[in-house]
Amino acid sequence: TPLDSLKYYKGFLHSGFVCMDTEMGDVKAYVGDIDYSHFRYDMAGQARRQVGSTIKPFLYALAMESGYSPYDLAPNEQVTYQVGDQEWTPRNDSQSRYGEMVTLKWGLAQSNNWISAWLMNQLSPELLVGLIHEFGVQNMSIEPAMSLCLGACEISVLEMVAAYTGFAKEGMRRAPRFVTRIEDSEGNVLATFVPQIHHVISRDAAWKMVELMRGVMDGGTGSRM
């Protein structure tokens, strides 16, 4: 029945995947969904979903641009922040090193929400929104809220992958390039498409971000990879 068909197709897990070359921005692989003949909504480029902790490198990049160092210290403790006429108390999964002063590098490596909230309070949600847009994210409805530092916004897979190229290439973001050139049947080049490169953060801040993000893989939440 039509109802059975709806239930069947609603049971599928949908996802998107993008692989980019950080040198030129060439898109090497792009998967919009399971099967275009049945699912024509592009989960990689059209769909925007909450990004969670993948937003944190942008917060730390803002901190590095503002003069912070990966080895600056922050209090690892739960704090209640006054946001307008409301209170916001972020939670954290781990109690490791609770009450200690820890480095920002440790905070990102452990994806610690308390350190992110502390940084957000030292900086500005408005500045973070501005930097996210500088990194190529086109969602203009991102709210400059404290909870943004924990991923309370929606970004597409394509936007996020392209944005991360700014960390890999010394602060120079590559826009996605799907076509390098167009030729006719005789091999004559009709059009070429040069890489679109945009400056997003300073070279110094980018190097600091490489140091910070390396910690995620060396001894943080990504160490199992």
Regions found by a protein language model. Name each.
Residues Y68-L128, R173, S185-V210, R214-G215:
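Conserved catalytic neighborhood of penicillin-recognizing serine enzymes
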Residues Y9-S15, H38-F58, Y71-N76, V102:
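Short active-site loop at a secondary-structure junction
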Residues T22, S37-H38, M64-D72, Q138-M140, ...:
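Secondary-structure transition/capping motifs at alpha-helix termini
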Residues W88-N92, L123-A162, G171, A175-F178:
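Mid-domain, small-residue-enriched loop/turn segments at the edges of structured enzyme/sensor domains
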Residues E23-M24, I34-H38, Q50, V79-Q82, ...:
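Solvent-exposed loop/turn segments at secondary-structure junctions
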Residues M24-G25, R48-N76, G107, A163-F167, ...:
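Active-site SXXK
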Residues T1-D21, Y30, Y36-Y41, I55, ...:
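A penicillin-recognizing enzyme superfamily signal
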Residues G16-M20, K28-Y30, D72-L73, W106, ...:
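Structural recognition of the beta-strand scaffold that forms the well-ordered cores
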